[in-house]
Amino acid sequence: HEVRGILETETYDWENDELPSYANSDVVAYNLHVRGFTKDPYSQVSAKGTFEGVIEKLPYLKELGINQIHCMPVYEFEERGRVPNYWGYGEAYYFAPKSAYSACGNGVISLKNMVKACHEAGIEVVLEMPFEGNVSVMEAIECLRYYRMEYHVDGFILNPCMEATRAAFSDPALKDTKLLVHRTDFQDIMRRFLKGDEGMIEAVMYWLRHLGGEEGIFNYITSHTGFTLNDLVSYDGKHNEANGENNQDGPDYNYSWNCGAEGPSRKKAVCALRNRQIKNALFLVLLAQGTPCLLAGDEFGNSQRGNNNVYCQDNPTGWVN
């Protein structure tokens, strides 16, 4: 095979960095978008929307009890096209950390600084790597190895349907790496139970006690794909008009319930019921067998105003606020 190039990086001082290496049973995870997590003017950090901004928020995450963060794509991708790409899915430059997420303009250094700071705080870093179908198995595996060895990343979230994912589970170089996959079974069952669908007890009991096998499955009721937890109890239907697709995009089946009023409400009974439902949802996630994962902002009622697909909303709608 012809060698077309090699990856070179400057020397970096990891200062005896040690990976926390928690058992899955001891993990409380937190799903965030690096830009959206601190981009809002009220985020109270100086380096808004960057890896450095995440570092500034580490004391908050520790106080919250988080010891693992799940980062949406942090590699280079095209943000501007026919439709803005805020999330980062699609074709990308997987081996290059995103320079726009760096306060100093050097994505390599900033990502390493973030990982090192997280480890010093006792927090693991898991990167979402949703490789496109045109990426070969070998390229995907090499990319995972690269981030593991060069950036000391603790794990990855992979597409369960891709051949590369199956290969990763058997790769010796990734033996001690946490390899996770998205599964919506827990989410859908618990949402239906929360809103009072009939005949859910047996399924709920199963998923409260279910543990994944080789695949690293984590439990969540909300993720970036869909409603936030506040919106889950505030809207019966999606409101994605701002995306410019006539409200045709995003999941149609959300298993949500607005508790008696669509959208924001000042009715005391509605607000009280919504607060109880939020607590019920968090109770189910945190006490079920398996690894719980919270969506950034759910802990204080972040809302996307009923938009359940903010893939193009690099603005207060898609930011945590």
State the predicted function of each range.
Residues 1-99, 204, 215-229, 235-252:
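N-terminal structural segment of carbohydrate-active enzymes
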Residues 1-30, 35, 49, 56-65, ...:
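Carbohydrate-interacting/catalytic domains
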Residues 28-30, 69-71, 125-127, 156, ...:
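Hydrophobic faces of well-ordered beta-strands that scaffold small-molecule active sites
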Residues 34, 73, 127-133, 160-162, ...:
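A cross-domain feature marking catalytic cores of carbohydrate-active enzymes
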Residues 43-50, 77-120, 124, 133-150, ...:
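Aromatic- and acidic-residue-enriched carbohydrate-binding clefts of CAZyme catalytic domains
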Residues 75-77, 100, 129-133, 162-164, ...:
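Active-site-proximal loop/turn and secondary-structure-junction residues that shape catalytic pockets
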Residues 152, 164-296, 309-313:
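Conserved alpha/beta catalytic core and glycan-binding cleft of carbohydrate-active enzymes
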